[in-house]
Structure formats: C-alpha cells, structure tokens
Amino acid sequence: MAFRKFFDSIEPDFKAGGKYEKLYPIYEMVETIFYTSSTVTKAAPHARSFVDMKRIMTYVVISTIPCILWAFYNTGLQTNIYLSEINSSELNGWRIWLLQLFGIPFNPNSIFANMAHGALYFFPIYITTLVAGGVCEVFFATKRGHEVNEGFLVSSMLYTLTLPATTPLWMVALGIIFGVIVGKEVFGGTGKNFLNPALTGRAFLYFAYPAYMSGDSVWVPVDGVTSATSLSISAAEGYQSLISYGITWSDAFLGTIQGSLGETSTLACLIGLAFLLVTRIANYRLIIGCLAGMIVFSSFLN
C-alpha cells in the first residue's frame, strides 16, 4: 500500500505537462514491476486474460533458468579442471582472489566450487549487457515517448548465454548496443523488427571479432588452454572422432563440454522448452516447423 501511495504521489510529475514528462517511460517501467498496468484496450476485440506482455516475458526469462544454472556449473567445471593442476601461488586475478578469500577450492568434483567459479564469469557479462543495452532501451523510449519494453530482459539473457566466458566486457557492451539499435530500434522498436536483437548482437561480434568468438582458445577462461568444441571436432573429423577426444553422447547431452556459457546442455534447453510448452507460451507447431525446416535445408546444403 505504501508503494502505491508513493507512485501515485509522484505520477503527476511524469505525466504530460509535468516537469519530468520526458522520463515517463522510466517511471512506467518501474511502476509496472510492482503493479499491473492500467492500460486497457478501447476497441474490440477484447482479450480477457491475466497474461500480458510482462507476464509472457517473465515466463520466458524463467525458462532460461536451467541454462543459467548450467552455465554456472559447466563454466566453473571447465575452468577448475585445469586450475586444479596449477600451483595456487601461480594464479592471479580478482576471481581467484575472491575464491581464495572465501576458501572455495578449485575442485572440479565440487558442485558448489564449480557453481561459484562459473557465476563469477556469468554475472559480469550479464550486468554489462543489462547496463549497456538498458541505456539504449531507455534512450529510445524517452525519445519516442513509448514504454520500455520487457522484451529486453529476454534479449539480455539470451545474448549473455550465447557468449564465451572469455568475452571482454567492452565487446559485450558493443555487441548488445549493436543488437538493440540495428536489430530492433531502426525498425521502430518491439513488434516492428524482424531481427532478433540478441542474435543480431552475437552475429555482429562473430563477424567483427572472429578470434574472440570462435577457435580453440576462447572456450576455457584459463590462459594458455586450448580446447575445441564438439561441433568443431565433428565438422573437421566427423562425429565418430568425438570418442577419441573423450566426449561421449551423455557428455554432449548433459553439456559437460566446451562451448558458450549457456549453449552446451541439451537437457537444460529441453527443460526450458518443456516449461514454455506447459505454460502455453510457446506453440509446439512453430517449434516442429522450425526444426523441420532447419533439418531439411541443412541436409540440402550439406
């Protein structure tokens, strides 16, 4: 109730004619975090549902949680596998300092140690994405006088999950800014764009800075360590050669392999998919159609 009174008291300053009217999109963004928007349709058809855009986007963000948790674990696992073989006195960096400060070992057999270490790579990238992309979103919202769309929460999460853990933070910011502006805002904003902002930003980084987005040295954040992904091995030598590299089908399915932060685990992706199907946010027909199209055209091109 106190929150409601607070928002009601400052709302006139952000409405048309108020001293902060240009900042209304920011006010609306914060208010709708706590309360349902009062905006309703004025012309038919009227869809009577509690599921609005904010709730849909919230469900999509929830569906990424399995991939996020696996990003923590697998990034820490791949890093600790190599760090456990190095003398701790030779290690440096703020992540190493924090882990040693709290007595967290570089033990690849410890779930907690892997999760903690992986989180120290995930959160800087995600926070950078939120800040850089969020500033772009707010800028265009205030300039055009429309609300800040919740879809950016989804874009920021998906973009983060597609990046290697070794991506420099300045590059993270550059990619998401490009994705938001070129992938969405130049077309008029959410609902008018035909490009996915997250994938647009990722594609930009891939072509602009290929050495940071591909190869054998970008997947494990340990200096001097090179390790190819299962896809690159399969492309170069055939999938039968994966066994010789110590990669089994169960490893590939669970995701205990090298790769981008949130893209290694098929199981985590399927759990997120199941959530979207159960909540009816995703339509199984679209998913089957996309898979069928990908398989057919990939077969032709190969």
Question: What annotation goes with each model-predicted range?
Answer:
Residues N149-V220:
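A generic, well-ordered mixed alpha/beta core segment in the N-terminal half of proteins
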Residues V131-E137, F152-L161, I176-G183, L267-F275, ...:
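Hydrophobic, membrane-inserted alpha-helices
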Residues G188-L270:
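Long hydrophobic alpha-helical segments that form multi-pass transmembrane helix bundles
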